[in-house]
Amino acid sequence: TENVEDLFEKFPDGFSVVNLWLYNNTELRVEVKGNPDTHQVTGVIVRRPIQVEENMVEEYKKAIYFDNGQMKMEDGSQVPEEFKDFRFLFQSFHFKESFFDMATFNVKKTSYTPGTSNYFISYYAKNAELAKYLKVPEDSQLKVQFEGDLQADEEHRFTRIVDVEAVDSRKSFFEKIHAE
């Protein structure tokens, strides 16, 4: 999907997307919701230091919207530097079969939680395109984890999380897409 607004084709009843980056002791987060009535995609961007405290103070939290796939600030100001070239993973990368052919399946990291119906499957892979999205060297070893919910799957309520971590650095992100 090139534009965030194109998600309405897959999720006509609306959607929410969270994209969270962790690096250099900083959390950068983009949260948006797609309104099915107006077809507008609005949300917030947040920057805050990663601390081991209950109430992490946000350096800033600002309202955003998307127009033709581009992030815009609700107040008309410039998009902060760390979000200037922001694209969701689903806009930038598609997990094709060839990715899984070349990835190493990590059986120890496969899990199903009976009490919650949550599951995840982890892979280790080297993928230049995904490394570029994570802004690490192209030959970096990546841990890629897919998460979902069996009960939601059975009820045709779509929720997927992709979690990517560069193994040799402390840089990671996750993206969650949820159908409303």
Language-model segments: which ranges?
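Short solvent-exposed loop/turn micro-motifs enriched in small/polar/acidic residues
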Residues: 25, 102-105, 139-143
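Extended lipid/amphipathic-ligand handling interfaces
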Residues: 5-6, 29-36, 143-152
